[in-house]
């Protein structure tokens, strides 16, 4: 942590095709080994597949899917007097987006379709319908927070 001043968060440039900052961030999350053009083709391919399959607006489907994956609360470990408690805490908006994108990509990578674009499209469509592994992950995190609600007074 800097001693002098708090460093502001960098603004990310919107993606060239749709002009969405959220989509640009997602492209960066999908990216592996700095190959941005590959990740762009994967994400744009997935959005194309969504447009063909569902017939709905692909950008709206993407944002709806992210809304269904974003966690509201999570648990953090807190050590109190020799024992560790899982303390439920609210998730900040930036982290909420980051977790949703990370879980979405992880869930897509575990799927069985042929190409990554197809896996991503499938997971996005499932998430838009409140199904799929990424939504299940969010439900598990919420369930964990609910189970540990008794330790909420240990919040810092």
From Swiss-Prot:
Keyword Ubl conjugation: no
Coiled-coil stretches: none
Record key words, sorted: Ribonucleoprotein, Ribosomal protein, RNA-binding, rRNA-binding, tRNA-binding
Domain of life the protein comes from: Bacteria
Gene3D superfamilies: Ribosomal protein S7 domain
Claim: Nucleus is one of the keywords in the record: no
InterPro entries in alphabetical order: Ribosomal_uS7, Ribosomal_uS7_bac/org-type, Ribosomal_uS7_CS, Ribosomal_uS7_dom, Ribosomal_uS7_dom_sf
Example of a GO cellular component annotation carried by this entry: small ribosomal subunit
GO molecular function annotations of the record: rRNA binding; structural constituent of ribosome; tRNA binding
Stretch forming the signal peptide: none
Function: One of the primary rRNA binding proteins, it binds directly to 16S rRNA where it nucleates assembly of the head domain of the 30S subunit. Is located at the subunit interface close to the decoding center, probably blocks exit of the E-site tRNA.
Record HAMAP family: Ribosomal_uS7_B
Family: Belongs to the universal ribosomal protein uS7 family.
Subunit structure, interactors included: Part of the 30S ribosomal subunit. Contacts proteins S9 and S11.
Official protein name in the record: Small ribosomal subunit protein uS7
